[in-house]
Structure formats: structure tokens, C-alpha cells
Amino acid sequence: MDIRYDCRQFKGTMPCQPHKVHGVECNLKCKYYVPTDGNILIIKLGAMGDVIRTTPLLIRMKKEFPNKRIYWLTDFPAVLPDLVDFPLTFSVEHLTYLRSLKFDMGINLDKESEACALLEQLDIKKKFGFGLHQGMPAPISESANHKFLTGISDTYSKANTHHYMKEIFDICDWEYNGEEYVLPSKKHNARIDSLDDSKPIIGLNTGCGVRWPSRQWPFGHWQEIANMLLTSGLHVLLLGGSE
């Protein structure tokens, strides 16, 4: 059997979707073959909101490199969309796997030392974002200087007029053209699906990332707004957990 290891749908540990749905075998005759020609790595561990805010990069990546496999290392793989071929976590198993690969492009948007060290260590042709200098987090590309300075200088940060999307696109040497967030595919929930869809459903995300506890809204405020929405005849849905 001529295995198409470079097919985007090839899993290696289980049958691919075309095999399950159409019964085709993985060989040179498969009409569902989707070729790939390289790999891209994104390192954006957290916080959850920042991971979601980084997803517009995927739109540009798919436009510039439609045949690349995209790997994303994060603490929140559940929020990654289907455009990511391999959602990975910062675990021994996944780090071991990453070290066996070669990447055409690697982007690290975190300044934590472990993320910076990993970008330095991996086999990546073109690196963007943050690495290490004398053992400390530092811009690994000139395009990351601006974002780096906003993190070490309050003066520079207060004078900064760039929004997050422009900053991360600048790091990759791309112009931000209004690319939007990309969310995971909808997953059906019987309790939510049973709600009266003639009324709007208002989601309240009551959690808060551990990095920014000052942004946590007081519990009483959540009660007040939930009661106000319910009184107005709207559905209220509490989202997430502690974060």
C-alpha cells in the first residue's frame, strides 16, 4: 500500500475521515488526498482570551501557505479552531514530538522563558517573536522589538497606540487587514439546543485568567446583570469555569 503520509487528513494512529465516510484506502488512487508541503508552528500558551485573539493569524497563514500543516502549542487547545492541524500542549509527550519535526516557520508570541527556550531549540528555518538572549526573554526578530518593549517599559506601554492584532501581525512581518477571530466548530449541547430560540441567549463568562485577577468582576455584579437579563425575558447562559 502506498501510504500518503503528507496528506492533511492522514492521522497515523486511526483511520482518516474519508476512509470512515467513503471507505477509501490511503493510496495513490484516493481522490480525497490533500497534499501538504511543510510545517508551521505557533507558540501561544495563554491566557485563553489571548489565544483566541491570536487566531486571526490563521487566516493569513492559510492564504500565504495553504499547503502547510499548522501546529499550535497552547495551554487551551479546546479553543483552537479546525484550521489548526495539530493542537498541542506543553507536555513531555508533545514536546518530544515537536523536537522530531522540521518547521518552515515558527512564531512565539509568549515571553515566558520556557516558550522562548523552545523556539530557540527547535529546528525552524524562519523564526519570529521571542527567544532568549543571555538566558533572558528577548526579541528573536527585529519585528518583535515593539511588542517586547511594551512589556518591559510602562512608559513605552502607555504611549503605545497599536492594538494587539496589529502587533502580532507586525511580528510576522504581515500587514493586518481586518482578519477576524476563528472559533472552534459548534458543538451541540442538548440542554442549550432545547432552549426557546425565539429569545436571544446571553452568555456570561464569569471566570477570569489567573494572570489578571484585577479584571475579575465582583460576584454580586454578575447576579445583578443576570437577574436584569432574566427579567427582560432573555436566556442567560453561564460560561466556563474558574478562568
Predicted regions and their residues:
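Catalytic machinery of carbohydrate-active enzymes
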Residues: 1-243
